């Protein structure tokens, strides 16, 4: 594959026109075979791994020959072998061919994605979720409106195949892809004759499909916004959710002035900022209300004409930043005014001026998190701590470590908020729930548990020093960090409680739209 990459730099046209012969390379299936065994060994016991898991290249060639037929029935995933291992053999060869198909498609896509968006010449890898917030702090306070939309999951398989034709001219290589997509659609029994492309399916093929789908949407969207908005700048950041392409892109695209600037869209310094985390894009706009309505209308038309997806107008929300909050990964986001007192001394006179700046204010959703803690049986619905009965069979150290880990992860994730009073309310709930769990285990009271285990035990587990022990700061810097917000670069995924709240929030919005 590395050799194919090197050849592709010299002749990219060969990549786009002759992908199909790669399906008959034995090295390709050796790679897919090893990857399949690695995944299987982690999910199956060792006694289920036998010598029968050997790849027959002749069987693979026959299977590819069947896929080449114009029959969209169960060609890829049907095995007529009557022996008891037929189901496992069927899955074995299916996964191997699917893995090989993904490897072939990933090579031209990785090259195409670098040049898919015009003007994107800077691409860096950021695996931390908190990398989204510095981008928001830099761009969003200067905007006055937000368009909140979500990338639709449902898409017809033929639409995906047609979009692949834009950058793959080798028609035979599209037949296996079409067969796989139609087979997946038929297996889900979808009445709308479409497939659901989600990044949470833990297979390499669907992760690639999601990355391609998102990149295709964004490349077309950016180019059209560039032509239609006539704005002077457009910045964007992309934060895929734990897929193969982790990146943050931030670049300014300068638009040429045209005669159309004399029209109604000749606004004073309009700007568009695009940021995406996972399947949720947010577009921040600085400009008049007409520009916001135009972008919102374009998003609906874009989905309808390019991907044949009908979306009701109210499914693309627009609201003003100064009056409403927007929910991002685990936070409520709003723009607040920050007054600054400036003193200037000139000769013998002292001038005092008040400057007001806008800044992003991330708010921790305390009440929803307490509701989630009540669902997990750490407290009741009013926030009163209760014992975690399912953990009473654990040792004392395990109980303390689990409660302490929940608190540290929660505080670590929400360290970017100025107001942490609500966080310490959650700390109180967790610490008292921990004490009640230990008391329930030993069939005694909290006072007896504190006396037997020592009063310093809970202070050690829930101390403020342990909240900042992962920071490479001195003690003075750690004390100062309690009054400041910190964005961490070591958070690979959203906090489970924050993720649960975000899903509930999205579900409420969806139900509100469906009414």
Swiss-Prot record:
GO molecular function terms noted in the UniProt entry: RNA binding
Main location: plastid
Keyword set, alphabetical order: Chloroplast, mRNA processing, Plastid, RNA-binding, tRNA processing
A GO term from the CC aspect: chloroplast
Kinase is among the record's keywords: no
Subcellular compartments: Plastid, Chloroplast
GO BP annotations listed: mRNA processing; RNA splicing; tRNA processing
InterPro entries for this protein: Domain_X (IPR024937), Maturase_MatK (IPR002866), Maturase_MatK_N (IPR024942)
Coiled coil: none
Stated role: Usually encoded in the trnK tRNA gene intron. Probably assists in splicing its own and other chloroplast group II introns.
PANTHER family: MATURASE K
Protein name: Maturase K
Organism encoding this protein: Pinus contorta (Shore pine)
High-level lineage: Eukaryota, Viridiplantae, Streptophyta, Embryophyta, Tracheophyta
């Amino acid at each position: 594959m590395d050799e194919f990459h090197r050849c592709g730099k010299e002749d990219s046209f060969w990549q786009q026109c002759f992908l199909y012969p790669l399906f008959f390379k034995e090295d390709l299936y050796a790679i897919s075979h090893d990857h399949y065994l690695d995944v299987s060994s982690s999910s199956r016991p060792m006694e289920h791994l036998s010598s029968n898991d050997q790849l027959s290249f002749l069987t693979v060639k026959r299977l590819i020959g069947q896929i080449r037929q114009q029959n969209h029935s169960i060609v890829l995933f049907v095995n007529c072998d009557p022996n008891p291992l037929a189901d496992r053999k069927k899955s074995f060869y299916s996964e191997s061919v699917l893995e090989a198909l993904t490897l072939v498609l990933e090579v031209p896509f990785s090259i195409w994605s670098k040049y898919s968006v015009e003007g994107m010449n800077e691409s860096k890898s950021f695996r931390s979720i908190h990398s989204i917030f510095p981008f928001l702090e830099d761009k969003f306070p200067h905007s006055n409106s937000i368009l909140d939309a979500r990338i639709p999951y449902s898409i017809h398989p033929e639409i995906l195949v047609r979009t692949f034709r834009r950058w793959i001219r080798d028609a035979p290589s599209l037949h296996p892809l079409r067969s796989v997509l139609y087979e997946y659609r038929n297996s889900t029994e979808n009445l709308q004759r479409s497939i659901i492309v989600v990044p949470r399916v833990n297979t390499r093929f669907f992760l690639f499909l999601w990355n391609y789908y998102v990149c295709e949407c964004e490349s077309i969207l950016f180019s059209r916004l560039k032509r239609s908005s006539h704005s002077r700048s457009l910045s964007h950041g992309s934060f895929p959710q734990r897929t193969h392409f982790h990146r943050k892109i931030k670049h300014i695209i300068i638009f040429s002035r045209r005669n159309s600037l004399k029209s109604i869209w000749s606004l004073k310094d309009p700007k568009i900022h695009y940021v995406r985390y996972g399947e949720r894009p947010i577009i921040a706009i600085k400009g008049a209300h007409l520009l916001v309505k135009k972008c919102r209308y374009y998003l609906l038309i874009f989905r309808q004409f390019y991907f044949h997806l009908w979306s009701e107008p109210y499914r693309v929300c627009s609201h003003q930043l100064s009056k409403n909050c927007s929910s991002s990964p685990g936070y409520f986001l709003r723009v607040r005014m920050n007054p600054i007192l400036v003193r200037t001394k000139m000769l013998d006179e002292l001038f005092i001026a008040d400057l007001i700046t806008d800044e992003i204010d991330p708010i921790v959703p305390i009440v929803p998190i307490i509701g989630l803690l009540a669902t997990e049986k750490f407290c009741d619905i009013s926030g009163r701590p209760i014992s975690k009965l399912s953990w009473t069979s654990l040792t004392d150290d395990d109980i303390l470590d689990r409660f302490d880990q929940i608190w540290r992860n929660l505080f670590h994730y929400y360290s970017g908020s100025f107001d942490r009073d609500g966080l310490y309310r959650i700390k109180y709930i967790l610490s008292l729930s921990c004490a009640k769990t230990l008391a329930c285990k030993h069939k005694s009271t909290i006072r007896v548990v504190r006396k037997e285990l020592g009063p310093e035990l809970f202070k050690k587990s829930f101390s403020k020093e342990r909240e900042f022990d992962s920071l490479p700061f001195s003690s003075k810097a750690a004390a100062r960090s309690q009054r400041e917000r910190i964005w961490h670069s070591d958070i690979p995924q959203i906090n489970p409680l924050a993720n649960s709240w975000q899903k509930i929030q999205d579900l409420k919005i969806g139900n509100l739209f469906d009414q």
